[in-house]
Amino acid sequence: MLSSLSSSITNARQSIAQVLNFALVLSTAFMMWKGLSVVSASSSPIVVVLSGSMEPAFQRGDLLFLWNRDTRTEIGEVLVYNVRGKSIPIVHRVVRTFPEVEGRASAKKGDNNLADDTELYAQDQDYLDRAEDIVGSVRGYIPMVGYVTIMLSEHPWLKTVMLGLMGLMVMIQRE
């Protein structure tokens, strides 16, 4: 009887250790994300290209690294910005600026698009404000790595499968 109690306590300790390991992995990933956010001064320091509007410069699925510590916006710079009232960030190139108004950039355009983005802006919005609308400037990229996120968005059941596999791996792992 004493040996079965000892075995139960050992199993409970192992289970708790596995759950804590899984929590450690998740919290480490979260801390790394927040650390990148602080260093880059961007709410989203890494984004995935979701459309072909920036081809041939960036393809759908490319992973972009952003930096948002610049105060000026230059023509030709590739920016990621949010349109007020919409939740998906847009990756486009600056084709015109307002030098007379500090911090304001206007007329982004996808390299593969015929027209600029002014039709995408919120009603009565003629420009993008650097402080409010810009998520960051593209400083680097890794081709096709972000395609995993696109697949997870397009096929929600894959998220469940991946989380289940990650949880299973943590639970199976013995130290």
From Swiss-Prot:
Entry EC no(s): 3.4.21.89
List the cysteine pairs that form cystine: none
Q: How does it sit in the membrane?
A: Single-pass type II membrane protein
List UniProt keywords, sorted A-Z: Endoplasmic reticulum, Hydrolase, Membrane, Protease, Signal-anchor, Transmembrane, Transmembrane helix
| Transmembrane stretches, start-end | 15-31
- The residues on the Lumenal side of the membrane are 32-175
InterPro entries associated with the record: LexA/Signal_pep-like_sf (IPR036286), Pept_S26A_signal_pept_1_Ser-AS (IPR019756), Peptidase_S26 (IPR019533), Peptidase_S26B (IPR001733)
Q: Which residues lie on this side of the membrane: Cytoplasmic?
A: 1-14
**Intracellular or extracellular location(s):** Endoplasmic reticulum membrane
Region ranges (C-terminal short (CTS) helix): 161-172
Active site per the UniProt annotation: 53 (charge relay system), 92 (charge relay system), 117 (charge relay system)
Q: Which GO terms describe its molecular function?
A: serine-type endopeptidase activity
Catalysed reactions, as listed in the record:
Cleavage of hydrophobic, N-terminal signal or leader sequences from secreted and periplasmic proteins
Q: Its GO CC terms? A: signal peptidase complex
Sorted alphabetically, the Gene Ontology BP terms of this entry are: signal peptide processing
Query: What is recorded about the protein's domains?
Result: The C-terminal short (CTS) helix is essential for catalytic activity. It may be accommodated as a transmembrane helix in the thinned membrane environment of the complex, similarly to the signal peptide in the complex substrates.
Subunit info here reads: Component of the signal peptidase complex (SPC) composed of a catalytic subunit SEC11 and three accessory subunits SPC1, SPC2 and SPC3. The complex induces a local thinning of the ER membrane which is used to measure the length of the signal peptide (SP) h-region of protein substrates. This ensures the selectivity of the complex towards h-regions shorter than 18-20 amino acids. SPC associates with the translocon complex.
The UniProt family comment states: Belongs to the peptidase S26B family.
Function per UniProt: Catalytic component of the signal peptidase complex (SPC) which catalyzes the cleavage of N-terminal signal sequences from nascent proteins as they are translocated into the lumen of the endoplasmic reticulum. Specifically cleaves N-terminal signal peptides that contain a hydrophobic alpha-helix (h-region) shorter than 18-20 amino acids.
Query: How is this protein named in the record?
Result: Signal peptidase complex catalytic subunit sec11
Query: In which organism is this protein found?
Result: Penicillium rubens (strain ATCC 28089 / DSM 1075 / NRRL 1951 / Wisconsin 54-1255) (Penicillium chrysogenum)
The major lineage groups are: Eukaryota, Fungi, Dikarya, Ascomycota, Pezizomycotina
